Amino acid sequence: MNRVLYPGTFDPITKGHGDLVERASRLFDQVVIAVAASPKKNPLFPLEQRVELAREVTKHLPNVEVVGFSTLLAHFAKEQNANVFLRGLRAVSDFEYEFQLANMNRQLAPDVESLFLTPSERYSFISSTLVREIAALGGDITKFVHPAVAQALTERFKR
């Protein structure tokens, strides 16, 4: 059985992330969205809320589960019996960092392969950082995130 781990901070999960998960759910037996605690990134939403939002966005996909983690990704992959890391590449600028990460993960978890998917063109420009910035300035984010995420961002930035 192929069990893929899609790690990220997902602060917040966007339509680009959702698209990648939907496509992965057709390619793999099981998809685990691994929501990283990432305290050094000082996330806008606490881990529990990011997990809940990811569950809401993917609840229509029966072979997808969402789990929060705060350990080393290689250790978490072993705990989850994952044999693949899935990462998205939006642009060439993402590649250098992702390439380094894949090589480090290969050293730490040699039995887990790293695979990259590019986003659908309509989502290739979306990033969680941009979505947060637009929301903070009162812009319309409904094109970029699921309604539950838009609501959470609106509530977070109420003035």
From Swiss-Prot:
GO terms for molecular function: ATP binding; pantetheine-phosphate adenylyltransferase activity. The record marks 17 as: Transition state stabilizer. Pathway: Cofactor biosynthesis; coenzyme A biosynthesis; CoA from (R)-pantothenate: step 4/5. Its cofactor is Mg(2+). ATP binds at residues 9-10, 17, 88-90, 98, 123-129. Disulfide bonds: none annotated. GO terms for cellular component: cytoplasm. Substrate binds at residues 9, 41, 73, 87. It is an enzyme of class 2 (transferase). Its EC number is 2.7.7.3. PANTHER family: PHOSPHOPANTETHEINE ADENYLYLTRANSFERASE (PTHR21342:SF1). Belongs to the bacterial CoaD family. Homohexamer. This is Phosphopantetheine adenylyltransferase.
